[in-house]
Amino acid sequence: MKLQTTYPSNNYPIYVERGAIDHISTYIDQFDQSFILIDEYVNQYFANKFDDILSYENVHKVIIPAGEKTKTFHQYQETLEYILSHHVTRNTAIIAVGGGATGDFAGFVAATLLRGVHFIQVPTTILAHDSSVGGKVGINSKQGKNLIGAFYRPTAVIYDLDFLKTLPFEQILSGYAEVYKHALLNGESTTQEIEQHFKDREILQSLNGMDKYIAKGIETKLDIVVADEKEQGVRKFLNLGHTFGHAVEYYHKIPHGHAVMVGIIYQFIVANALFDSKHEINHYIQYLIQLGYPLDMITDLDFETLYEYMLSDKKNDKQGVQMVLIRQFGDIVVQHVDQLTLQHACEQLKTYFK
């Protein structure tokens, strides 16, 4: 499947298929030099997939740490210095091969190297079906996640679904959170459909039917980011579950998707409190338990600490914390939420696990 962005200009293709990696070679000849930034995990299992590409004299491989460990100032500077030592021109390509963190990091390198060079995304995880599309790139700060970054469109996104075969279950769980988020944004019927399809751990682990929902998720995100690239309006909806989720992820050092799922439950509790919504919290908790999400850490949540991280969320303004909330399916809002409501929601969340 080939999708295409529909901006007024500077559009890029998104290949979503098995064997999609073959498309990389069609781009290599266009650049003076190319640097494949590949995470250590992918390099361990799939290094041979890039043998043909690396046979080009002007293609270099840079192995970087997997996951959020790579999104640091130290790694950023080290990578830039290595690339600059090759006397690069602006007709250079940075090719990100790995999960969402790899794409974030490599994209920020591409956006800032010589004030912008070509950038190709080659996502290798379910989670990255979300982050590879839309042009958000960046690294982390001690103050929080993704606070240093840019909007920078890739030249192409090449999503080879064969990479998913070796994902450990923890990565499947983490990635599914973003797939499920897109279903929630699409509405109640789509949410019910995906819950009925992936109804337990065994089915989710098999990845049976995942291709369809990944493609649907990408289409959902494309519709939103083309309408609002710089996150001034509806693109904020894509942060569903992320205000509280990012705080939980950053403080408790758990996988991104696991934290987002906690954030999704949390926003349902907040929506019930603010709008008298009728979301069945037990339903969502039981669904996550059936899928195998480890939720024991919820009893250890410390609101005061998490609130400090929430205050650093990029959606906030001078009025305080903003959250994306599902008032009811089909009615999504970005709402300021006061500290007391947030605290009560955190306390209520914890009561479900006592």
From Swiss-Prot:
The gene is aroB. The keyword Metal-binding applies. Its cofactor is NAD(+); Co(2+); Zn(2+). Keywords: Amino-acid biosynthesis, Aromatic amino acid biosynthesis, Cobalt, Cytoplasm, Lyase, Metal-binding, NAD, Nucleotide-binding, Zinc. It is found in: Cytoplasm. Its EC number is 4.2.3.4. The lineage of its organism: Bacteria, Bacillati, Bacillota, Bacilli, Bacillales. Belongs to the sugar phosphate cyclases superfamily. Dehydroquinate synthase family. Zn(2+) binds at E178, H242, H256. Pfam families: DHQ_synthase, DHQS_C. GO terms for molecular function: 3-dehydroquinate synthase activity; metal ion binding; nucleotide binding. This is 3-dehydroquinate synthase. It is an enzyme of class 4 (lyase). Its main location: cytoplasm.
